[in-house]
């Protein structure tokens, strides 16, 4: 073995031992659970049970795509907040170049937000087309 390999082994032996110990512990727990765990079968064992109520109907429900859209917009703007927080922490070190980069980043995200707003991605319910009925007053 070369000196580099020996130095590498000396540096990372604890990490390798930890990984081996984690896998051994997981195998031990799974094996003990399969040997010692109870095995009872019955019709009530296969029913889903949540909060003291036995479920009725199908567990598969159709969700609107709007939920997915809201989740994606949340993730996008949450990542924006993480990047801007990192910039805010190091604002003194990055100087005007960093400020310009953050300004471009914010501008691009604001342009995306305006686009989402214009195409209706932020509206939960569709807009009603046409005129609204006139208000009739009673006398």
Curated annotation (Swiss-Prot):
Its main location: membrane. The chain crosses the membrane at residues 16-36, 69-89, 94-114. GO terms for cellular component: NADH dehydrogenase complex; plasma membrane. InterPro entries: NAD(P)H_OxRDtase_bac/plastid, NADH_UbQ/plastoQ_OxRdtase_su3, NDAH_ubi_oxred_su3_sf. Pfam families: Oxidored_q4 (PF00507). It is a multi-pass membrane protein. This is NADH-quinone oxidoreductase subunit A. It comes from Chromohalobacter salexigens (strain ATCC BAA-138 / DSM 3043 / CIP 106854 / NCIMB 13768 / 1H11). NDH-1 is composed of 14 different subunits. Subunits NuoA, H, J, K, L, M, N constitute the membrane sector of the complex. NDH-1 shuttles electrons from NADH, via FMN and iron-sulfur (Fe-S) centers, to quinones in the respiratory chain. The immediate electron acceptor for the enzyme in this species is believed to be ubiquinone. Couples the redox reaction to proton translocation (for every two electrons transferred, four hydrogen ions are translocated across the cytoplasmic membrane), and thus conserves the redox energy in a proton gradient. It is found in: Cell inner membrane. Its EC number is 7.1.1.-. One of its GO terms (molecular function) is NADH:ubiquinone reductase (non-electrogenic) activity. HAMAP family: NDH1_NuoA. It catalyses: a quinone + NADH + 5 H(+)(in) = a quinol + NAD(+) + 4 H(+)(out). It comes from the Bacteria. The keyword Signal does not apply. Keywords: Cell inner membrane, Cell membrane, Membrane, NAD, Quinone, Translocase, Transmembrane, Transmembrane helix, Transport, Ubiquinone.
